[in-house]
Every structure is written in structure tokens, then in C-alpha cells.
Amino acid sequence: MIAKNIYEMLQDVCSRNKDSIFFVRQNETYADLLKKVKQRAVLLAQRFGIKKGDTVAILSGNTPDFLRSYFAITSLGARALMLDTGLNTNEHINMMKRTDCKLVMAQQSLFIDDAPCPMFDIENIDDTDENEFTMAQTERSDIAQLSFTS
């Protein structure tokens, strides 16, 4: 099967490796990963109204929550704006404004007081019903990720 989008690729990998360990420290399997991605996507859609074409930033270190968030954002057809933790606050704010960012999923220690959109703790995800998840219909030409370079 050739995946049409990032979420279908994830779904395929998780279904073929569902009992394999994805994250050793938390003994999390690929099946657990897929469930958490769906839960996070439901939260983004229901609590924040995130939908296809919106931009959601991620400001986090290299953690499982970063990956869960990335896959959740793209599964909704939204664009993930990657914010480099090594850049300064003004640069982050500029990127958020230029991309019409709707939400920032960030580690709480990296929250920005003057952010032009809401900040949400990337590690503080409530349990939502993953059965309410609906994958967005996307095209190969849809943008999944935004990155700024120097």
C-alpha cells in the first residue's frame, strides 16, 4: 500500500508493528502511539477547533509528545509549524504571525508570554475518545509542515 498522507503512513507502520515497542522508557507500543495520536487529534479538533489548512506550532524538545503532536496535527490536515527551541522568543512570535498560527503546543517551560495565539502544554493531554477521530481528506499537494531556515 502506498500511503496518501503522513497519517496513513503512520497507521500502516503501527498496524504492522502494533506490539513492538515505540518508546522504551514508557513501555509504549506502536498501538499505544496510534491511540494517543488519535486522542490528541480529537482534543485539537474539539477543544481548539483545529481543522484542515490551519497552522499549529510545536515548541518542544525531542520527545514522544513532539511526535504524537506532529502526527495529530497532520492527521487533521493542519500544518505543523516547527519552532526551533534554540531560537529566541521574538523569532518564534514572528513565525507564528507570518503563518497565522492558531495554537502552539509547547513544553510549559518554553511558553511565550506574548504569543499571538493560545499556548497549550504538550505534556498535559486529557484522555479523549479516540473513536471520535476522523482523518482529514488530504491531497498530495497539501502542506503538512512549515519550517523556517536562516
Predicted ranges, named:
Residues 1-21, 144:
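A short N-terminal helical cap/helix-turn-helix that marks the beginning
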Residues 19-21, 130-148:
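Conserved pre-ATP/AMP-binding loop-to-beta segment of ANL
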Residues 60-62, 107-108, 142:
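Helix N-cap/beta->alpha junction signal
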Residues 68, 75-139:
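Structural core segment of the AMP-binding/adenylate-forming
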